[in-house]
Design a protein with these regions (language model features):
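Juxta-kinase regulatory segment immediately upstream of eukaryotic protein kinase catalytic domains
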Residues: 2-39
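ATP-binding pocket architecture of kinase catalytic cores
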Residues: 43-200
Length: 201
């Protein structure tokens, strides 16, 4: 995986001691069996609905051949066109959907301690695959192939159907935005928060 080469911003994860703090946090909350965490490659992906999405290859310096993996770090943006942002809500949705037929990554840990990376973030497993950019999809080979394009459409509709089967009332961030009814408590009383920092449960 190539490293990101864009000019880093002031609060970029690659600047200062942000990576060192993140490495310590990953060891404590995601990879507790490791002696330490060392980054071997990292790149910020495009898209992400304004959230920062980083692919990170990590290894244990004490046993790099046996202990290495790739994780995804999603961090809240400073600002964006669809505020407010809440990456911890996103993690709750992922958790709720994980047992359904909707393909989502497994949440490994969450953190809203701003002393780690400056903003709340979550860590998920890496799922191999390709997410076509809707802005350029018509130029992709699979789009020009009628059979493959039909397959993409069927896959999309299949996932959409699985999403429709999910009971939205069990997805806390979604249920919390619905207007309270006579037989349902208000969003404020229904809403609960995960621990400040820690592994997924």
């Amino acid at each position: 995986m190539p490293s990101a080469t864009a000019t880093p911003r002031r609060d970029d994860l690659r600047l200062g001691d942000s990576l060192q703090r993140l490495a310590l946090w990953l060891r404590d909350h995601v990879l507790p069996a490791w002696d330490g965490v060392r980054f071997t490659a990292m790149a910020r992906t495009s898209g992400g609905v304004s959230y920062e999405t980083w692919l990170m290859d990590v290894e244990d310096p004490a046993a790099p051949a046996e202990r290495h993996t790739r994780v995804v770090v999603r961090r809240e943006p400073l600002r964006g066109p669809v505020e407010p942002y809440d990456v911890l809500d996103e993690a709750e949705v992922y958790r709720a959907l994980h047992s359904s037929g909707v393909p989502v990554p497994r949440v490994l840990a969450t953190c809203d301690d701003r002393s780690v990376t400056g903003r709340p973030f979550i860590v998920t497993e890496f799922v191999e695959g390709d997410v076509p950019d809707y802005r350029t999809i018509q130029r992709r080979p699979e789009w020009r192939d009628e059979r493959r394009r039909a397959g993409m459409a069927r896959e999309f509709l299949s996932v959409l159907a699985e999403l429709q089967r999910v009971d939205w009332r069990r997805v806390v961030p979604v249920a919390a935005t619905a207007p309270p009814g006579p037989r349902r408590p208000s969003a404020r009383s229904r809403r609960t928060r995960r621990p400040t920092c820690g592994p997924s449960r």
